[in-house]
């Protein structure tokens, strides 16, 4: 169960994707367990709860969240179809993972998404 490598969106987080069996966030044990999970990847599916992304920068975490949400949308649509999606070649998955790691290593990673989000907020007249 979980996301399958069936779209470019999921490939952008595939090598950075982890799953966490969600518990009550009010306990120190759950917080510690989530911290351990995040050591395995910055794009986290909290089973039966939602999504969490972390990273070195807020813009980077925002971009991960955007791509992870899109990957989930594609997965839900694909599961609603009566046939399996065509698989993505394992070499393409590997190459895309290498490219995604290079992009995430750039200090400007996610900045375009961050600036776009700020423009949307400011366009609505929202005051900080």
Language model region names:
Residues 1-128:
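Glycine-rich flexible loops
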């Amino acid at each position: 169960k979980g996301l399958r490598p069936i779209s470019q969106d999921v490939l952008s987080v595939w090598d950075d994707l982890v799953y966490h069996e969600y518990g009550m966030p009010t306990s120190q044990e759950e917080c510690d367990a989530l911290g351990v999970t995040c050591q395995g990847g910055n794009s986290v599916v909290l089973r039966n709860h939602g999504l969490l992304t972390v990273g070195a920068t807020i813009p980077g975490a925002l971009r991960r969240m955007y791509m992870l949400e899109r990957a989930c949308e594609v997965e839900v649509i694909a599961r609603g179809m009566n046939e399996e999606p065509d698989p993505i070649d394992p070499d393409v998955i590997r190459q895309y993972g290498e490219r995604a790691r290079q992009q995430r290593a750039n200090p400007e990673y996610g900045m375009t998404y961050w600036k776009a989000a700020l423009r949307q907020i400011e366009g609505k007249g929202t005051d900080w």
